[in-house]
Amino acid sequence: MADNKGVVTTIGRKKLCMAHAGDAFLPAITKMAWGKGGVDENGQPIATTGNEIGLYQELLVKDIELHTYVGDTQTTCRYTATLEAGELDGEEISEMGLYDAEGDLVAYRTFMRKGKDADIPQIYDMDEIF
């Protein structure tokens, strides 16, 4: 199994660094993406590198529905989006990512395959932890 299944990407870390230095504006996270390229031939999640610039087999990108801060310290933000009934029917989802308003993948994770039934929505949360 992969040691590291989720990561803030290199471009995401670069943007954070430059924003903290006051040299750049940090665009908001606005989209969640799902794909089926997050597992190896044995169905195990592949390790993430941080160098990902997109999902390996991206299937769908949607707007973030909401975000919430986890805990009192507000150092984790949970982003939520839903695969509705009728979306990605029959697909096996194994990777997801967060895109910012400039279209850059800033967070990526892999996981075991999740089958998508036609008549059942699936709600996905992805945490950005600082």
Describe these PLM feature segments.
Residues M1-I93, A101-F130:
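Small cysteine-rich, disulfide-bonded extracellular modules of the LU/uPAR three-finger superfamily
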